[in-house]
Amino acid sequence: MATRGHNPRANNEGYIGRPGKQWLQVNAKTVNIDGVDIKEAVTGGQYAPIPNMIHSAAMHNGLYRGKNLTEYFESGQMSTDIADGTFANIYIGDYINKPITVNGTTYNVKWEVADLDYFLHSGDAETTAHHAVMFPSVTVQTNVPMNDTNTTAGGFKGSKMWGDTIPLYVTGIKAAFGADHVLTHRELLTKTVDVNADSAAGAGWKGSTTDWEWTDVDVNIPSEPMIYGTAVFGSSGFDVGNKEKQLAIFRFKKFSEGRKWFWLQAVASSSRFAIADNYGTASFTDASLSYASGGVRPYFLLR
């Protein structure tokens, strides 16, 4: 059946034939919702003006942009758009350039938006405030061990990392962003290890976490699922806790800009913790490892 010049409707909608001319006619149409020209907003990369009906953490977690939000944060508007849950001009991969000082050393950090509302409604004391998970684009500090010796006794909560190193980052991040912008939330952290129990990491390894505890957290290092979307070398389900899903940024950006490994919370055995390797692999290493090729890459919740 010939279709050239077929015109099914009086207003030319659905016109078939002469594609060059007809595409220009269709493309010239304005799609307007709530006073916003959607075609202009999308083709111009201006996501923020799109109507509020599609502004949410769920929608914005599915878009990677990579825009510098430093001035936006300093203006105070970013915190307003987080607090109301619209995240109106905040997308995954957007970032804030903000140096932090840790134990007397200042690090210039590009803090990327890694996820929106990751911990919302989680915790024994429910997290009800909207938030953005901020995660450095690179490993911040190298030559930092998880423990002084090759032991995982006490789980992650009993580690030197949690007891000594993380508090230094809490101080540095609160000083840089303002304490009111750092959301305290609740996480399950492992606290006991049975050195004789089989590790879920396999390979005949011994040492498995056996308990956890709800803990106030301002700053932390990631779990395995936050990076990979699943447990890999974790010794048991206790290593996952309430950090059981992948951060949105790792669905788009599966690398560290500086190619340095970083520690993860999971106990792998009686002497090892999990790491995200600088070669792009899920891995593990001795708890006392202190080396220039890796270290600490902490996250916090911005409000």
Regions found by a protein language model. Give the residues of each.
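Collagenous Gly-X-Y triple-helix signature in extracellular proteins
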Residues: 46-303
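Intrinsic low-complexity, repeat-rich intrinsically disordered segments enriched
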Residues: 1-50
